[in-house]
A protein has these predicted regions:
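Active-site SXXK
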Residues: 1, 25-55, 141-149
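Short, conserved catalytic-motif segment at the N-terminal edge
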Residues: 1-26, 50, 118-125
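Short, surface-exposed loop or secondary-structure junction motifs
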Residues: 13, 67-217
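A broad detector of the eukaryotic-type serine/threonine protein kinase catalytic domain
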Residues: 25, 60-64, 126
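Generic hydrophobic/packing signal
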Residues: 39-44, 59, 79-86
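Short, glycine/proline-biased beta-turn/loop segments that scaffold the active-site neighborhood
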Residues: 51-66, 167-168
């Protein structure tokens, strides 16, 4: 295709009065869920994954809502936020500056396995069974990312670069700070009591601990 129109607005840095440019890098938050879902659907197209299958078909460590141990969680339920997986306290507590220090697999297993660092039956799951109701779940998309890793035997960031970013010529897109030129990154700000509060420069990529800019991917 051909780009018909492109324009940037606003400031990349307020202190330096630096305008936003067409090549300025930005944190995209939950928009990254689009890439996770695309990776899942690619695997479905290849016949490597069944959307209606129990996710434990593909995971090395099983995940079940302890209140409904006999009800499987499906891939489709993760995609549609109906899995009964809840963003517990560990979700917010695990935000950190910079690239992740533990793997996605290690974090997810710590969240869902009894005895794990982040395991909490009430915090991590809803009372209703999988498929019963819609409830937005960032952690659920983290599980989808782990499904991609388990099936392809590649880190999510590597799979998406090879099969999504590179084919689409998205050469300045990535999950990790180490994948991009941070000098081209807009300076992030918090919005607090009508004031723009600058985040620490070292927190350019305010990422969720397990290898994904996100679950607010």
């Amino acid at each position: 295709g051909t780009v018909r129109w492109m324009q940037a607005y606003g400031h990349a840095d307020l202190d330096q009065d630096k305008p936003m440019g067409k090549s300025t890098l930005l944190n995209i938050g939950s928009i990254s869920k689009t890439f996770t879902a695309t990776a899942i659907m690619q695997l479905w197209e290849q016949g490597r994954l069944d959307l209606d299958a129990d996710i434990n078909t593909y995971l090395s460590r099983p995940i079940r809502n302890p209140a409904h141990p006999d009800v499987p969680i499906t891939v489709q339920q993760l995609l549609t936020h109906t899995s009964s997986i809840r963003d517990g306290a560990a979700y917010d507590e695990s935000y950190a500056c910079g690239d992740p220090t533990i793997s996605l697999k290690a974090w997810i297993e710590g969240y869902f396995q009894s005895g794990g660092n982040y395991y909490d039956t009430k915090e991590n799951f809803y009372a209703k069974a999988p498929g019963a109701e819609h409830a937005y779940s960032n952690i659920g998309f983290g599980v989808l990312g782990l499904l991609v890793e388990e099936i392809t035997e590649k880190p999510l960031y590597q799979y998406t670069r090879e099969h999504i970013f590179t084919p689409l010529q998205m050469d300045h897109t990535g999950w990790l700070l180490s994948e991009v030129d941070t000098n081209s990154h807009a300076r992030p700000y918090f919005f607090v009591t009508a004031e723009n509060i600058e985040m620490l420069r070292v927190c350019l990529n305010f990422v969720f601990e397990p290898q994904m800019d996100g679950f607010w991917l």
